[in-house]
C-alpha cells in the first residue's frame, strides 16, 4: 500500500512539472510515466487518465495551500497587534512565493485558466475572491478587537491584497525580482497598517 501511495505522489509531482513547463495539452501520459520510471499502462493502475491526474493534482495542491496559507473558511488566529499582523501575513506570502510546488501550480493555473473551467475558478479564488474573502474576515476580526479602524472590511481587504497579487505575479514571471517583490509587499502592508490601524502605544 505504501508503494502505491508513493507512486501516486511521484505521478503527481511529475505531472505538475510537465504541466507547468509544457501545459496540459502539451503533456502526455507517456511523458509522465517516463519521468516516474514506469510504463504508461502501469500509470492507469493509479489514475484513470490525464484528467484524473489533473483533478488529483488540483485537490492535493488546494489542500496543501489551505493548510499552509489559509482560506476564507480557515483564517487562523486573529492577530492581536500590528506587528503580529505583519509577521503572519508576510509569513503566508513568503511561503506562497518561495515554495517550489506552489510556484509550479500557480504558473500552471495562470497558463491554463482560459482553457479549463475548474482551473479558471481556482485561479480566480486564489487571485481575487478567496484571498480577499480571507483577509476581509481577518480585518473584521481586528476591527472587533479595536485594532483596525471601522470601515468596510471587503474594501480594505481589496486594497491590502491587490498589490500583493500583482507583486507575486511579477516574481513568478521574473524570479530575479522575488526579494524586491517581497520587500515591496511588506512596505505596502506596513503602509496599510499605518493608514487603517490604530497605534497600540
Question: Language-model segments: which ranges?
Answer:
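Hydrophobic/aromatic-rich alpha-helical bundle segments in the mid-to-C-terminal region
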Residues: 121, 125, 139-191
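Hydrophobic/aromatic residues within well-ordered alpha-helical segments
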Residues: 50, 57, 61, 65, ...
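Short amphipathic alpha-helical interaction/hinge segments
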Residues: 61, 65-69, 117, 164-175, ...
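N-terminal intrinsically disordered/low-complexity leader segments
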Residues: 1-6, 201
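Hydrophobic alpha-helical connector segments
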Residues: 56, 70-103, 154-160, 186, ...
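Helix-loop "lid/cap" segments that line or gate small-molecule binding pockets
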Residues: 90-98, 106-114, 192-196
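Amphipathic alpha-helical packing segments from all-alpha helical-bundle domains
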Residues: 98-100, 104, 110, 117-144, ...
Amino acid at each position: 500500500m505504501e508503494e502505491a501511495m508513493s507512486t501516486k505522489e511521484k505521478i503527481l509531482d511529475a505531472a505538475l512539472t510537465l504541466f507547468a513547463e509544457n501545459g496540459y495539452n502539451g503533456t502526455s501520459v507517456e511523458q509522465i510515466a517516463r519521468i516516474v520510471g514506469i510504463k504508461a499502462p502501469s500509470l492507469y493502475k493509479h489514475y484513470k487518465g490525464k484528467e484524473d491526474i489533473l483533478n488529483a493534482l488540483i485537490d492535493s495542491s488546494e489542500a496543501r495551500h489551505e493548510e499552509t496559507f489559509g482560506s476564507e473558511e480557515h483564517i487562523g488566529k486573529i492577530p492581536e497587534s500590528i506587528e503580529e499582523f505583519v509577521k503572519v501575513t508576510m509569513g503566508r506570502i513568503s511561503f506562497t512565493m518561495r515554495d517550489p510546488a506552489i510556484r509550479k501550480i500557480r504558473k500552471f493555473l495562470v497558463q491554463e485558466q482560459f482553457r479549463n473551467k475548474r482551473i479558471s475558478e481556482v485561479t480566480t479564488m486564489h487571485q481575487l475572491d478567496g484571498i480577499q474573502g480571507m483577509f476581509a474576515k481577518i480585518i473584521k476580526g481586528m476591527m472587533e478587537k479595536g485594532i483596525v479602524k471601522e470601515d468596510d472590511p471587503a474594501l480594505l481587504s481589496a486594497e491590502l491584497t491587490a498589490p500583493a497579487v500583482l507583486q507575486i505575479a511579477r516574481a513568478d514571471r521574473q524570479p530575479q525580482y522575488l526579494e524586491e517583490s517581497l520587500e515591496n509587499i511588506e512596505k505596502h502592508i506596513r503602509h496599510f497598517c499605518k493608514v487603517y490601524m490604530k497605534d497600540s502605544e
